[in-house]
Amino acid sequence: MKFISLRTAPAAAFAVALTAAFALASTVLVPFAHAEEVGSVNTNFRITGSDRVVVEAYDDPLVQGVTCYVSRARTGGVKGTLGIAEDPTEASIACRQVGAIHFSGPLKQQADVFSVSMSLIFKALHVVRVVDTKRNALVYLTYSDRVVSGSAKNSVSAVPMPAGTTIPLK
């Protein structure tokens, strides 16, 4: 029989509460990314689900006419099938003008545009939009983070605005 010391009980309770808070925050604070999977390739065959690289399209919600394509690894196997696998942190991004540019409103100088979970609780992939006013371009940066530590692995893409189009700023 294992006894818990009264000195360690508050620490254990704090750890459980902190874990629950992070789990709740990850479901509430990380918005659901509306991705459209446009393609994928298998990289490692498994009977229970192959590892693969997927390409997803994300339309910028505030800038009509701009789509970002993100490629990233998805873990297969039993854990991947159940949705509890932790996907690798590597991702690549390419953003393009795919139609007429229209702004839904003024943009922040820098804003988190998309987030998608890469593990059950603790890891997310982000796409951040940065306005480069000097060059009249929208710059999109992708990176991943964890509750404890992030990743320096990142990728960047820029979409120049057509001549005569000014980016409205807040």
Model-assigned labels for residue ranges:
Residues 102-170:
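Beta-strand-rich cores of mature extracytoplasmic or soluble domains
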Residues 35-76:
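N-terminal export/targeting and maturation segments
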Residues 1-5, 31-36:
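Basic/polar N-terminal segments that are highly enriched at the extreme N-terminus
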Residues 67-131:
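Mature extracytoplasmic domains of secretory-pathway proteins
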Residues 2-20:
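Bacterial N-terminal signal peptides that target proteins for export
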Residues 18-32:
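C-terminal segment of classical bacterial N-terminal signal peptides
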